[in-house]
């Protein structure tokens, strides 16, 4: 609501006289004001406590610059600004009109040529933004104002230059979840194609009155965004095809704004604006200059027309009352279905971290960065008595409080006017992985005689772990783009290997321990000389994140699986690609060599395990998993069995016959990691339920449950002697557990 000025509010900012409040946020205030000539303006002011922070001033200046670069034809034009003032402020033109969200929610969806005109106007706006070298990154219904002359795009608080490499922590994801692109949700590079994906989502909302990817949980929304597109019977065929094109998972396959404009201009003049059922709502917005009241109303809405859709206070008509089904070219008589308000339009700040599949959706995201925690997460497990208190690293946060905190976008909707402002603040520690001094044993300690697990901690998420063949070294991969190598006996960090430019997802030692392989979100596989702590080779060929790697038993080959849907074999001696293993239709999560080195197995989100001949690269067999996702894989030491993890179960296969042998049940969430003990008697599994479970393979029953991690477990590895087990978790720890074999 519009409120009177409060005691302590400034009477004037720059040359603008403030007349009322439009909204307050955690870091700023938005006022209604008048220019010296009496024109209505909206003034955004940063609170003094944040104005004293140089980082805030820089970010605010960037927002001003972004809005100015685009200009006023497609946006709320910046009239004036002073980012160096005390406090910093920006004045923008007042645009009479409701937000798209308000209009559709209160009056119903758009249809036919009205929808096409909206689409063309939005594409023009995005084209102008992209032509200035910017990406909006928060394109959604509440950031679109329906003015009398067409739609306007507002809020450049999260817009970012295409060539910008500063101002946001690497891997940070910004935006509103239900309108994000797949690359936004997992922290990938975001370009103009990301806005095009969001455009498709906005048009689907405008045509149906509901967010197409909305679901009951945040995890489900993520899964829907990266899954098959929903059906849209409400859209005419041409617009449905356009929206589906915008929703291509591969950003390179989405149409450009120029291509979209060319399609929308065919057989359409653009004269259908404003939509008839919205004309009174758009026309009712009175210019502020029309009143001299000290607290003028921005909008006066007349009673709804008798022929229009029902108002929200009226009962919704029963769909059964209509004899005819509503067509794609005429409005539905029902108002949009209500969406869960806490998920639909609440912007979030996402700190890039390894992603975990949601517990319930049919198609989880890869075990990758960018997982959003549920709105009501499980209570954190208490720290065991031997573990000292530690500061948790930043996680995905859904910021939905009325008083915004650092990183929240505040959108103020008052009588049809939407004014949005954004100020970001967050820091991510760059502290390297380090042994926890309170639990690390002395150099003389025997790691096999520990009563409690030893803990190596990090201020970033730990996502990969591997023992060297002799068991003296432990390697770990994390979100800091580094590989860390520790001495197992002392807990001292021996090496930090630098070279990857993104998350290190997987690590594996060669059979002789001389080399270490690593796979990363930078789409490369790298080989390292362990003794010299130097990079030996870089294998390039994948076009997306490398999710898993494995050394062949003789050390001559490295296998890799990627989000690009392929597995690849690399020749270690020559540094060349030996084979590209094609057949999966979705991400390849896991790869594993058979102990004799003749086969390599790959597991995919397509629900299959494929067995490949290493020498020829030909497919030998396909195992259809009972669950839809194969997230992790391992061969038994004798090669007779293959195990994979999926939803909340662990599945055991007979390799020779391809028959399923047993399903281990006990986990309550996705199983990201599996490993056999060196003697094959035990099977370890790590899960999003924050536990590691050991299973007796012969007895086909649970042996032990290891508890202590407070976040999902991404990787497990047995010590070569089988008496300890290492685990890596999103909680920032790598734990080395003693294993009782009796």
Curated annotation (Swiss-Prot):
Per UniProt, what is one Pfam family of this protein?
WD40
> Which key words are in the record?
ATP-binding, Kinase, Nucleotide-binding, Repeat, Serine/threonine-protein kinase, Transferase, WD repeat
Q: Does the keyword Transport apply?
A: no
Sequence ranges assigned to domain Protein kinase in this UniProt record: 16-266
* Name of the protein: Probable serine/threonine-protein kinase PkwA
Q: Locate the region Disordered.
A: 266-394
Which gene codes for it? pkwA
Q: For binding ATP, which residues are annotated in this chain's numbering?
A: 22-30, 44
The catalytic activity, as recorded, is: L-seryl-[protein] + ATP = O-phospho-L-seryl-[protein] + ADP + H(+); L-threonyl-[protein] + ATP = O-phospho-L-threonyl-[protein] + ADP + H(+)
In this chain, composition skew of type Basic and acidic residues spans: 343-356
Record field: compositional bias (Pro residues)? 301-318, 377-392
Q: Could you tell me which residues the WD repeats occupy?
A: 455-496, 497-538, 539-580, 581-621, 622-663, 664-705, 706-742
Family designation: Belongs to the protein kinase superfamily. Ser/Thr protein kinase family.
Q: Which domain of life is it from?
A: Bacteria
Q: Write the Enzyme Commission number(s) for this entry.
A: 2.7.11.1
Q: What does the UniProt function comment say about this protein? A: May play a regulatory role during the complex growth cycle and in secondary metabolite production.
- Sorted alphabetically, which InterPro entries does this protein's record hold? G-protein_beta_WD-40_rep, Kinase-like_dom_sf, Prot_kinase_dom, Protein_kinase_ATP_BS, Ser/Thr_kinase_AS, WD40/YVTN_repeat-like_dom_sf, WD40_repeat_CS, WD40_repeat_dom_sf
